[in-house]
Amino acid sequence: MRIHYLLFALLFLFLVPVPGHGGIINTLQKYYCRVRGGRCAVLSCLPKEEQIGKCSTRGRKCCRRKK
């Protein structure tokens, strides 16, 4: 029965996100960008695009064509 506590503790340590990584947040931001009709740009948006948000905590921009 004690092994269950050890396994639970190890599972918990693997599921806790690393500070600064933001894996779940980045995934949600990318999904929200796609829902709004945008794309994730690495550096900046193209000249005929406008920035409508962010795709990650590290600075990727969500861009879509200007209306």
Swiss-Prot record:
Listed Gene3D superfamilies: Antimicrobial Peptide, Beta-defensin 2, Chain A
InterPro entries named in the record: Defensin_beta-like
Signal sequence, renumbered to the chain: 1-22
Keywords assigned by UniProt, alphabetized: Antibiotic, Antimicrobial, Defensin, Disulfide bond, Secreted, Signal
Signals that turn on the gene: By bacterial infection and by IFNG/IFN-gamma.
GO molecular function: CCR6 chemokine receptor binding; chemoattractant activity
GO biological process: cell chemotaxis; defense response to bacterium; defense response to Gram-negative bacterium; defense response to Gram-positive bacterium; killing by host of symbiont cells; killing of cells of another organism
Disulphide bond pairs: C33-C62, C40-C55, C45-C63
Subcellular location: Secreted
Cellular component terms (Gene Ontology): extracellular region; extracellular space; Golgi lumen
Chief location of this protein within or outside the cell: secreted
Top-rank taxon, per record: Eukaryota
UniProt tissue specificity: Highly expressed in skin and tonsils, and to a lesser extent in trachea, uterus, kidney, thymus, adenoid, pharynx and tongue. Low expression in salivary gland, bone marrow, colon, stomach, polyp and larynx. No expression in small intestine.
Role this protein plays: Exhibits antimicrobial activity against Gram-positive bacteria S.aureus and S.pyogenes, Gram-negative bacteria P.aeruginosa and E.coli and the yeast C.albicans. Kills multiresistant S.aureus and vancomycin-resistant E.faecium. No significant hemolytic activity was observed.
Homology family: Belongs to the beta-defensin family.
Protein name: Beta-defensin 103
Source organism of this protein record: Homo sapiens (Human)
Lineage: Eukaryota, Metazoa, Chordata, Craniata, Vertebrata
